[in-house]
């Protein structure tokens, strides 16, 4: 299941109505999401704890990879934060529970805009894992990148546990001089 929060540019609007996708746009849709989504996440968490009873060595990663894929796609975290102005804590709680229960979170940040100190922005700024695509100097989510880790065309920066690692993006091949 995919939950899509489009930006005001509506560049992803053509996905509205796609099978397996919930396009969250209006205030009513956001309210429904905040009512229903946490329950789905709690069901996932409960299912994991139940599976642990029969297999105490089952890792969360293994379990969540074996059940239905759930992904949140957020085009512009600042716009989402603005739309959630009265429900910041609920949305930040959803994001945290989503991450905890193996739900993928894909989000874009407009580097010139992300200045907020709201709950949603704080969630993203305190993340310990992610991949950075684009100019690392303009990201307000991840810490500064050392010169030796600056990516070249076709690469991204994987951020894990406070460290960056250059990674090749699918569809690109490294040349001899880049490698």
Say what each PLM segment does.
Residues 136-179:
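Conserved P-loop NTPase
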